[in-house]
C-alpha cells in the first residue's frame, strides 16, 4: 500500500509530459497551417488586383470601341461661307436701332423673328438657323461655318487662307471694292469682317473667294513694298559735311514753301515740285534727300508747337521698278504716287526719292534693246503735273548721268531746282573728316602727348595731316593724264576723284589698322600714321579701278566735262617694296561705259 502510493506522483508527471508534447506538436501544425493560409491570402489578393486592372482595361477598351462605332455612324459635317447675318428684329423695330454691323449685314425691310444667317453652300445661297450654342455676335461675314446634317450652323470657324489674288482698283462705300483679277477682269467683291477693320487702299492685293464673292485677306505685295521705304530717316543736315552751300540752296527751295505757305501765296509763288541732285558718285546725294525729310518733320513740329510731327520718305529703288511685263512699271509708279498722296492728305510732308533716276527716265528714243522709256517717262510727267495735285509732296531725283534724263522731266515746273553736288575740296574734306574722326574715338597716347593731352587738338592735327596728304599734287598722287581733242593735256590727281564715301572708307581703314595694332602689339588708339597709311592704301586700291574704255562716258560720270577727251593715260604708282610706278595707255574706244 505504501509502495503504490509512492509511485503515483511519478505516473502523473509522466502523463503530463506526454500531454505537453502533444500540445506542442498541435501548436506547430496549426502555426504551419496559418502560414499557408497567409500565403494563400496574399496570392489571392495579388490575383484580385490583376483581375481588377484587367477588368478596368477591358471596360475602357469597350467604351472606346463603342464611341468609335457611334462616330462611324454619325453624319458628316459640312463647311460653308457666311454671307450675311440676320439678327433677331421685330416688325416694329427700326433699322436705325440696330448696331452698325447689324445694319450692314441684315436684310433690311424684313422682320426677322429668329436669328439666322445666309450662307454660300455648294454653289447655292441659303438661309439657315443657328445652334443655341453659337453666339451670333461672334460671327462675321466671309467667315467659314460648320453645318450639321440638317444644315444648322453649329460652330464658327476662321477665314479661308487660300484664294485668288486680286488688286483693288476702287473702293465702293465702306464694305465693297472694285477689283481686277486674272486677264484684267473686273468685278465687285464684298469686304470680309476681317478686312472691315483694316485700312484698304487702291492697289492693295487681296485674297478673294470667287464662290462667295468676298475678299478675305490682305496680301502683302513684296514686289512693290520692297521698293518703298516709308521710315523717316534720322539723318540731319548736321550729319552732312562739306556741302554747306548746296544744303542752304535745298533748304530755301524745300522748307520755305512748306513752312510759310501764306507768304508764298501772298507773293504769287508756287512751291517747287521737284529737285534734281546730280554729281559724281559718293558725294552725298542720298544723304541730302534723307535729311530733307527729317528736317521737314522737325520744322513742321516747331511751327505747330508739337513735340513730333510725322513725315515720310519714300525711297524708290529705281532699277527694281523695271518689269518685263508691259504696263507693270507704270502701275508701280501710279501706286507710289497714290501712296504719297495718301500720306500727304493729312498735311504731313512726303519726300519721294528716285535714286539712280537715269536708269528709269532716260531720254525717249535712246533705248538700244527696248523702248520702255517711251511710256515710263510720260507716266511720271502725268503724276508730277497731272490733274491731281501733289500737295505736300516733294519729288527728289538723284543721278550721276543727268545728261541721260529726259529733258521733259528737267524743265521748270517739274524738277524746278537743280543742285550740283560737287566733289569736296580740301576745306570740305576736312569738314567731312570731322564727322567721322571725333574726340570720342580712342586716340594713341603718343599723339595725345604731342598735343598737350588735348583730344580736340589731336583730332584737328590728325585731320589736317590727312587732308594735306590726300590733296597734295606731288608725283606720288598722280592718277590720270587726259588728252583733250584740241591737243591739251592735264594731269589729274587723287584729290580730283575724292568723295565723301572715299573719306569714310579712309577713316574705317584707319580704325581697322588701330585694332590690328592693339591685338598684335598692345598699343591702343588711332594714330596719324594709321590715317596716312589708310590714304595711301585707298589710293593704291583704286589705281586699277577707273574704267576708261569710253573716255567721254567716263568723263561724264567722273564730273570731268568740257572739252572732249580723246586719250587717257592711267598712272600706276608702285607700292612699297614693289616695282616703281608705270603708265597704262588707253586708246579711244566707242564702247559703252559698264
From Swiss-Prot:
<comment type="function">
    <text>ATPase which is responsible for recognizing, binding, unfolding and translocation of pupylated proteins into the bacterial 20S proteasome core particle. May be essential for opening the gate of the 20S proteasome via an interaction with its C-terminus, thereby allowing substrate entry and access to the site of proteolysis. Thus, the C-termini of the proteasomal ATPase may function like a 'key in a lock' to induce gate opening and therefore regulate proteolysis.</text>
</comment>
<dbReference type="GO" id="GO:0019941">
    <property type="term" value="P:modification-dependent protein catabolic process"/>
</dbReference>
<dbReference type="GO" id="GO:0005524">
    <property type="term" value="F:ATP binding"/>
</dbReference>
<dbReference type="InterPro" id="IPR032501">
    <property type="entry name" value="Prot_ATP_ID_OB_2nd"/>
</dbReference>
<dbReference type="Pfam" id="PF17758">
    <property type="entry name" value="Prot_ATP_ID_OB_N"/>
</dbReference>
<dbReference type="InterPro" id="IPR003959">
    <property type="entry name" value="ATPase_AAA_core"/>
</dbReference>
<feature type="coiled-coil region">
    <location>
        <begin position="18"/>
        <end position="71"/>
    </location>
</feature>
<dbReference type="InterPro" id="IPR022482">
    <property type="entry name" value="Proteasome_ATPase"/>
</dbReference>
<keyword id="KW-0175">Coiled coil</keyword>
<dbReference type="InterPro" id="IPR041626">
    <property type="entry name" value="Prot_ATP_ID_OB_N"/>
</dbReference>
<dbReference type="InterPro" id="IPR003593">
    <property type="entry name" value="AAA+_ATPase"/>
</dbReference>
<feature type="region of interest" description="Docks into pockets in the proteasome alpha-ring">
    <location>
        <begin position="593"/>
        <end position="594"/>
    </location>
</feature>
<dbReference type="InterPro" id="IPR012340">
    <property type="entry name" value="NA-bd_OB-fold"/>
</dbReference>
<dbReference type="GO" id="GO:0016887">
    <property type="term" value="F:ATP hydrolysis activity"/>
</dbReference>
<keyword id="KW-0547">Nucleotide-binding</keyword>
<keyword id="KW-0647">Proteasome</keyword>
<protein>
    <recommendedName>
        <fullName>Proteasome-associated ATPase</fullName>
    </recommendedName>
</protein>
<dbReference type="InterPro" id="IPR003960">
    <property type="entry name" value="ATPase_AAA_CS"/>
</dbReference>
<dbReference type="GO" id="GO:0010498">
    <property type="term" value="P:proteasomal protein catabolic process"/>
</dbReference>
<comment type="subunit">
    <text>Homohexamer. Assembles into a hexameric ring structure that caps the 20S proteasome core. Strongly interacts with the prokaryotic ubiquitin-like protein Pup through a hydrophobic interface; the interacting region of ARC lies in its N-terminal coiled-coil domain. There is one Pup binding site per ARC hexamer ring. Upon ATP-binding, the C-terminus of ARC interacts with the alpha-rings of the proteasome core, possibly by binding to the intersubunit pockets.</text>
</comment>
<feature type="region of interest" description="Disordered">
    <location>
        <begin position="1"/>
        <end position="20"/>
    </location>
</feature>
<dbReference type="Pfam" id="PF16450">
    <property type="entry name" value="Prot_ATP_ID_OB_C"/>
</dbReference>
<keyword id="KW-0067">ATP-binding</keyword>
<feature type="compositionally biased region" description="Polar residues">
    <location>
        <begin position="1"/>
        <end position="12"/>
    </location>
</feature>
<comment type="pathway">
    <text>Protein degradation; proteasomal Pup-dependent pathway.</text>
</comment>
<comment type="similarity">
    <text>Belongs to the AAA ATPase family.</text>
</comment>
<dbReference type="GO" id="GO:0000502">
    <property type="term" value="C:proteasome complex"/>
</dbReference>
<keyword id="KW-0143">Chaperone</keyword>
<feature type="binding site">
    <location>
        <begin position="282"/>
        <end position="287"/>
    </location>
    <ligand>
        <name>ATP</name>
    </ligand>
</feature>
<dbReference type="Pfam" id="PF00004">
    <property type="entry name" value="AAA"/>
</dbReference>
<dbReference type="InterPro" id="IPR027417">
    <property type="entry name" value="P-loop_NTPase"/>
</dbReference>
<dbReference type="InterPro" id="IPR050168">
    <property type="entry name" value="AAA_ATPase_domain"/>
</dbReference>
Amino acid at each position: 500500500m505504501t509502495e503504490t502510493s509512492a509511485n503515483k506522483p511519478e505516473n502523473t508527471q509522466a502523463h503530463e509530459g506526454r500531454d505537453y508534447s502533444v500540445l506542442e506538436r498541435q501548436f506547430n501544425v496549426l502555426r504551419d497551417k496559418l502560414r499557408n493560409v497567409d500565403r494563400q491570402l496574399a496570392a489571392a489578393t495579388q490575383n484580385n488586383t490583376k483581375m481588377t486592372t484587367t477588368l478596368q482595361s477591358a471596360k475602357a477598351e469597350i467604351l472606346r470601341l463603342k464611341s468609335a462605332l457611334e462616330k462611324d455612324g454619325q453624319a458628316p459635317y459640312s463647311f460653308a461661307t457666311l454671307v450675311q447675318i440676320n439678327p433677331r428684329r421685330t416688325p416694329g423695330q427700326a433699322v436705325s436701332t440696330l448696331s452698325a454691323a447689324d445694319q450692314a449685314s441684315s436684310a433690311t425691310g424684313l422682320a426677322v423673328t429668329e436669328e439666322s444667317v445666309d450662307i454660300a453652300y455648294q454653289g447655292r445661297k441659303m438661309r439657315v438657323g443657328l445652334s443655341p450654342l453659337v453666339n451670333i455676335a461672334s460671327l462675321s461675314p466671309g467667315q467659314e461655318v460648320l453645318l450639321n446634317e440638317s444644315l444648322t450652323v453649329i460652330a464658327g470657324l476662321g477665314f479661308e487662307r487660300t484664294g485668288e489674288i486680286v488688286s483693288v482698283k476702287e473702293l465702293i462705300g465702306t464694305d465693297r471694292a472694285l477689283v481686277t483679277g486674272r486677264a484684267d477682269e473686273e468685278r465687285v467683291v464684298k469686304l470680309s469682317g476681317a478686312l472691315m477693320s483694316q485700312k484698304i487702299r487702291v492697289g492693295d492685293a487681296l485674297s478673294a473667294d470667287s464662290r462667295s464673292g468676298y475678299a478675305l485677306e490682305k496680301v502683302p505685295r513684296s514686289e512693290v513694298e520692297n521698293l518703298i521705304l516709308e521710315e523717316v530717316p534720322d539723318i540731319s543736315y548736321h550729319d552732312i559735311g562739306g556741302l554747306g552751300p548746296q544744303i542752304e540752296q535745298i533748304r530755301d527751295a524745300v522748307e520755305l514753301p512748306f513752312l510759310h505757305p501764306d507768304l508764298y501765296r501772298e507773293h504769287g509763288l508756287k512751291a517747287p515740285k521737284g529737285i534734281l541732285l546730280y554729281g559724281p558718285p559718293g558725294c552725298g546725294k542720298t544723304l541730302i534727300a534723307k535729311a530733307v525729310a527729317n528736317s521737314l518733320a522737325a520744322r513742321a513740329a516747331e511751327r505747330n508747337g508739337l513735340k513730333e510731327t510725322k513725315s515720310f520718305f519714300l525711297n524708290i529703288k529705281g532699277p527694281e521698278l523695271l518689269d518685263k511685263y508691259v504696263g507693270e512699271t507704270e502701275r508701280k509708279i501710279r501706286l507710289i504716287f497714290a501712296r504719297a498722296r495718301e500720306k500727304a492728305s493729312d498735311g504731313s510732308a512726303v519726300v519721294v526719292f528716285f535714286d539712280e533716276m537715269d536708269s528709269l527716265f532716260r531720254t525717249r528714243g535712246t533705248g538700244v534693246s527696248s523702248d520702255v522709256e517711251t511710256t515710263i517717262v510720260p507716266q511720271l510727267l502725268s503724276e508730277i503735273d497731272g490733274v491731281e495735285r501733289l500737295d505736300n509732296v516733294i519729288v527728289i531725283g538723284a543721278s550721276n548721268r543727268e545728261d541721260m534724263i529726259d529733258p521733259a522731266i528737267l524743265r521748270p515746273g517739274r524738277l524746278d531746282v537743280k543742285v550740283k553736288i560737287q566733289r569736296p575740296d580740301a576745306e570740305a574734306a576736312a569738314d567731312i573728316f570731322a564727322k567721322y574722326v571725333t574726340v570720342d574715338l580712342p586716340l594713341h597716347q603718343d599723339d595725345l602727348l604731342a598735343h598737350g593731352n588735348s583730344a580736340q587738338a589731336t583730332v584737328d592735327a590728325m585731320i589736317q595731316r590727312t587732308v594735306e596728304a590726300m590733296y597734295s599734287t606731288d608725283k606720288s598722287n598722280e592718277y590720270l593724264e587726259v588728252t583733250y581733242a584740241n591737243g591739251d593735256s592735264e594731269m589729274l590727281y587723287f584729290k580730283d576723284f575724292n568723295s565723301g564715301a572715299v573719306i569714310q572708307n579712309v577713316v574705317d581703314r584707319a580704325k581697322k589698322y588701330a585694332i590690328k595694332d592693339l591685338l598684335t602689339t598692345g598699343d591702343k588708339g588711332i594714330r596719324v600714321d594709321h590715317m596716312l597709311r589708310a590714304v595711301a592704301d585707298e589710293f593704291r586700291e583704286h589705281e586699277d579701278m577707273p574704267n576708261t574704255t569710253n573716255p567721254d562716258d567716263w568723263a561724264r560720270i567722273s564730273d570731268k566735262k568740257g572739252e572732249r577727251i580723246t586719250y587717257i593715260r592711267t598712272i600706276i604708282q608702285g607700292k612699297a617694296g614693289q616695282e616703281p610706278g608705270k603708265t597704262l595707255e588707253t586708246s579711244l574706244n566707242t564702247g559703252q561705259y559698264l
